[in-house]
């Protein structure tokens, strides 16, 4: 597969009112093309990060929605890929991944049975030291896909999502959360986490800064969600909405953060949300930066993720995408794969943001 090397300059000059003043400005950043893996281009994959290694797992590709169960390891220091052991089960899409104590975990998602698909709840542990998978307790919240996941304090957390097979009084869209203890005894590795007061959401996203998880985006049916939450392992706190809905006009400018199927990652103590789809119809190519010290977002619709790349069944220059995944070390952030219409991607980009400066 052809891979074109390109860096893209991005404009990031929006200033947001409130505690942000006209003196604060985030300057240009750059997307840098990295090596692509030697596997099938895809969307709705899962990912997790262990140290300086990112892992890409599963997803699907093509008009027939061929579900994948392969695993790829990206060495960030060497910009190289290695194929690892496949998951020992059928391929899946829209699962979630997280890492705890040097091991990666994949759970939930959707698998294919002939021409139809159904949601699952099985959980699998990957040990990079042995390149082997081990089955763990099934996710206690039940089957679903499009959930979100993160890890803090030596535990993994999974919540929200949708069970498209729900019947009767059961709600398809979920707002529950569960904690995974990798050292727990068999049969007791998952426990419910209470206190989340946010919306039911499908294809939301989460990022972690200093052992605090931040949850945003996603949709409920076709409505994009504006609520924004943080969780420190014990307490949930609602933050300002990610849309200009505040009656006190905290946000002077139009916010365009709301979306689902987005990618998030952390660089230097700031969270980033990129790509995705708005109102279930309009693909996004922009990215936004969140400063937890100010509880403010920076960016605008001109801050595009606009890599020029070889895409499949689509004209070159396409950039907007949904259902991509990300890697995050806390100091480096990557966006890879995804889909745009009938196109699927295998490209990998790293964001190199410039620092905030006083002007």
Set out the residue ranges of the language-model regions.
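Sec-dependent bacterial lipoprotein signal peptides
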Residues: 1-19
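Kelch-like beta-propeller repeat domains
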Residues: 20-359
